[in-house]
């Protein structure tokens, strides 16, 4: 993928980000709303989004639930030491579990950090997330050489890209 886009798409992309950086509007048809704000048709807006995705400017558009407001106040990043040659298969198994929100591979930093497979779980209690950890441990079986669970000590709010507003300059 190339991050090169046309100058006109770059201007539209900036406006699109400014319009949506706080989230998509809660309207019946957010694409129609965005199209109207950009002074484009819906088809042109969707084509713009596709071009931006194809160029690697946009990776994805997705709903991001607030786990805390949904009652999931306990989080655990489970970390696993598994054989590097088996991590792809094992990661797919773990990532496919319904209670794993995201799962990925990270480099080891030996001797301080031996873990290479990470899986985030959310629950309504410490016991629930510990139960999820046990389920992952059972799934990995003998492939799991060691594991730990890192728990959140405070809430960190994730945000998307934020652009500074352009300064208005007098003529």
From Swiss-Prot:
Any single biological process term in GO: heme biosynthetic process
Pfam families linked: AsnC_trans_reg2 (PF17805), NirdL-like_HTH (PF22451)
Catalytic activities: siroheme + 2 H(+) = 12,18-didecarboxysiroheme + 2 CO2
Gene Ontology terms for molecular function: lyase activity
Superkingdom of the source species: Bacteria
Phenotype on disruption: The nirDLGH mutant lacks dissimilatory nitrite reductase (NIR) activity. The NIR activity is restored by adding purified heme d1.
Family: Belongs to the Ahb/Nir family.
This protein's name: Siroheme decarboxylase NirH subunit
Organism placement in taxonomy: Bacteria, Pseudomonadati, Pseudomonadota, Gammaproteobacteria, Pseudomonadales
């Amino acid at each position: 993928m190339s991050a090169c886009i046309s100058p006109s798409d770059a201007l539209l992309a900036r406006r699109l980000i400014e319009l949506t950086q706080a989230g998509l509007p809660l309207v019946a048809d957010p694409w129609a709303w965005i199209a109207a704000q950009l002074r484009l048709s819906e088809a042109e807006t969707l084509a713009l989004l596709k071009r931006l995705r194809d160029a690697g400017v946009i990776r994805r558009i997705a709903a991001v639930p607030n786990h805390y407001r949904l009652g999931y106040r306990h989080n655990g990043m489970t970390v696993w030491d598994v054989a590097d040659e088996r991590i792809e298969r094992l990661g797919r198994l773990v990532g496919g579990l319904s209670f794993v929100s995201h799962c990925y591979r990270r480099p080891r930093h030996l001797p301080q950090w031996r873990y290479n497979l990470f899986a985030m779980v959310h629950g309504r209690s410490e016991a629930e997330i510990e139960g999820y950890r046990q389920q992952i441990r059972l799934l990995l079986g003998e492939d799991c050489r060691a594991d730990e669970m890192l728990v959140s000590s405070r809430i960190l709010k994730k945000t998307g890209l934020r652009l500074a507003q352009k300064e208005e300059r007098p003529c």
